[in-house]
Amino acid sequence: MGNAWSLISQMFPPKPKWSVNDIPDLTGKVVIVTGGNTGCGKETVKALLAHGAKVYLAARSEEKAKEAITKLKEETGAEAIFLSLDLADLVSVRRGAEEFLSKEKQLHILFNNAGVMLAPMDMLTKQGYDLQFGTNVIGHFHFTQLLLPALLAAATPTEKARVITTSSSANYMGTLDFNVWKDSPARSKKASGDLYVQSKHGNVVFAVELARRYGEQNIISHSLNPGSIRTDLQRHLSPFANKMQDVFLFPADMGALTQLWAGTSPEAGKLNGEFMIPWARLGKARKETGDPAVGKKLWEWLELQCKDY
């Protein structure tokens, strides 16, 4: 009952008590937003630019990213920097991280925002993983790991570095099955929705474990449900499903609110390993996401998948 109630109640959150106007001055802060060319990511970049941050917009499509950068400059007067990143290819992930590290010594905030939802089952990552789990969890894990030197360089006891990972209310709907994330007979028995749920559950497990491992080194790691948001994530849904779902969806600027709160507010900076819910509130993820044994198992599995890349 608790998981079901959490899922349903977060579809209809109360009016926010925090807004982008409450974001502190971010002058001198270096930030990366994955999937920053569209939806919640783009709105996140917009708010960060408006408050003085130096923002790297990480995306797969250079054309779409540069269109977004041009539009955002018109709206804010500030220009984001394109960072080439395909989370579905671990080689591209390393290349993107190395490009960033060649330009910056410090990274103050990393928004692991990009995601794939309900992709067709025949879609796999470059290395043969389920596209959803590979993009949402494995790609972001590898990217975060490679950027740890810059995060640690930016982190101090009074100004901690932050890693904010976007999950969803889907984290309440299931747990992890380590046997279905690579193309296999076991995976073929699963539905796309189940694999999406696992990826969102995995986002929270990863975020909690990151806090557990690096909290003492002044890195804050939170995950969140951005809310029921109208974005490109729904591109794999049928027209009928899109139309039905549209009734319950909020605009992308609302979807950026909770991750901006997690990533910039003094309140969220006093916490670690938490799960945030719409709009800009502290919540609770599914209980299993906080299990240290599960966190350790997932972390070690992810390290094994990424070690050759």
Curated annotation (Swiss-Prot):
Q: Which pathway is this protein engaged in?
A: Secondary metabolite biosynthesis
InterPro entries tied to this protein: NAD(P)-bd_dom_sf, SDR_fam
Which EC numbers does the record give?
Answer: 1.1.1.-
Q: GO MF terms on file?
A: oxidoreductase activity
Q: Where does NADP(+) bind?
A: 64, 86, 113, 196, 200
Active site (UniProt) = 167 (proton donor), 196 (proton acceptor), 200 (lowers pka of active site tyr)
Enumerate the UniProt keywords alphabetically: NADP, Oxidoreductase
Give the biotechnological use. Answer: Melleolide sesquiterpene aryl esters are cytotoxic secondary products with anti-cancer potential. Armillaridin shows therapeutic and radiosensitizing effects on human esophageal cancer cells. Armillaridin induces autophagy-associated cell death in human chronic myelogenous leukemia as well as of hepatocellular carcinoma cells. Armillaridin can also inhibit the differentiation and activation of human macrophages and thus might have potential to be developed as a biological response modifier for inflammatory diseases.
Miscellaneous comment: Armillaria species are both devastating forest pathogens and some of the largest and oldest terrestrial organisms on Earth. They forage for hosts and achieve immense colony sizes via rhizomorphs, root-like multicellular structures of clonal dispersal. One genetic Armillaria gallica individual localized in Michigan's Upper Peninsula stands out as exceptionally large, covering hundreds of tree root systems over approximately 75 hectares of the forest floor. Based on observed growth rates of the fungus, the minimum age of this large individual can be estimated as 2500 years.
Family the entry assigns: Belongs to the short-chain dehydrogenases/reductases (SDR) family.
Role, per record = Short-chain dehydrogenase/reductase, part of the gene cluster that mediates the biosynthesis of melleolides, a range of antifungal and phytotoxic polyketide derivatives composed of an orsellinic acid (OA) moiety esterified to various sesquiterpene alcohols. The first step in melleolides biosynthesis is performed by the delta(6)-protoilludene synthase PRO1 which catalyzes the cyclization of farnesyl diphosphate to protoilludene.
- Any idea what this protein is called? Short-chain dehydrogenase/reductase ARMGADRAFT_1018437
Give the species: Armillaria gallica
Traced from the root, the source organism's taxonomic lineage reads: Eukaryota, Fungi, Dikarya, Basidiomycota, Agaricomycotina
